[in-house]
Amino acid sequence: MKAKKKWGQNFIFDKNLLSKIVRASGVGEEDFVLEVGTGHGGLTEELAKKVKKVVSFEIDKELFEMSREKLKIYKNVVIINEDILEVDLLEIAQEHFDGNSFKVVANLPYYITSPIIMKMLDCKLVKEMTVLVQKEVAERICALPGTKDYGMLTVFVNFKAKPEILFNLPPKVFVPPPKVESSLLKLKVYDKPLVEVKDEKLFSEVVRAAFGQRRKVLSNSLKVLGFSKEVLHETLLKVGISPQARGETLSIDQFANLANALYLLIKE
């Protein structure tokens, strides 16, 4: 079956490579696993041999029918024909994993990688993710402050999880080959966020504002939050950040300190 461009489909058929991905994920016989993008069912099948149960989402009706037929011999596999971004993960866990925590292993559709990762990290039952993503995205997630790859995605992911690039894959291992290299990325989710913030929503707003206009200094870019330049100037100095600094130079700790200081101002 031909890959459909609109779904960002790039399949892996090499069983040795699929097996390597499953081994690298570290999943075992007691694990519940959620997969995004069943495709032809190759990765699903390798997972089914190793874990307690796999729930796999496939948005493409034809692939869903085909993979469901192919994998019906596995009693620990459930394939669902729905858009992962539209489902309630807690309900899925309740229905299929007895409400237990689960791991995510997937060859993610590249055009919606970030929304899927963020949705998973927002679910308190996701303990770990091992996902194939564009190499460029993996490098952005693992970037350090002050580098060109460091951005909003870096901060949001690292706030919730510890990222590690396990290995890279060339385009030729996929059918059809994408135009870019890929990486297998592991995200170990923290029991609680890396830093303590008083208000996660405000923390997110501060990060978004700081990166919203990358060339602007913080005392200007943060004005969209409704604070005057003078108040921002004073607050930044109070938490040890130069008002002339730009968002891409701040560590997650600094973002947290800034958000917490602004939170206290709002509460006054």
From Swiss-Prot:
Stretches of the chain forming a coiled coil according to its record: none
GO CC aspect terms: cytosol
Domain of life (superkingdom): Bacteria
EC number: 2.1.1.182
Compartment(s) where it occurs, according to its Swiss-Prot or TrEMBL record: Cytoplasm
Binding site for S-adenosyl-L-methionine: N10, I12, G37, E58, D83, N107
SMART domains: rADc (SM00650)
GO MF entry, a single one: 16S rRNA (adenine(1518)-N(6)/adenine(1519)-N(6))-dimethyltransferase activity
Catalyses which reaction(s): adenosine(1518)/adenosine(1519) in 16S rRNA + 4 S-adenosyl-L-methionine = N(6)-dimethyladenosine(1518)/N(6)-dimethyladenosine(1519) in 16S rRNA + 4 S-adenosyl-L-homocysteine + 4 H(+)
PANTHER family given in the database record: DIMETHYLADENOSINE TRANSFERASE, DIMETHYLADENOSINE TRANSFERASE-RELATED
Job description of the protein: Specifically dimethylates two adjacent adenosines (A1518 and A1519) in the loop of a conserved hairpin near the 3'-end of 16S rRNA in the 30S particle. May play a critical role in biogenesis of 30S subunits.
UniProt xrefs under HAMAP family: 16SrRNA_methyltr_A
Identification of the protein by name: Ribosomal RNA small subunit methyltransferase A
Organism listed in the record: Caldanaerobacter subterraneus subsp. tengcongensis (strain DSM 15242 / JCM 11007 / NBRC 100824 / MB4)
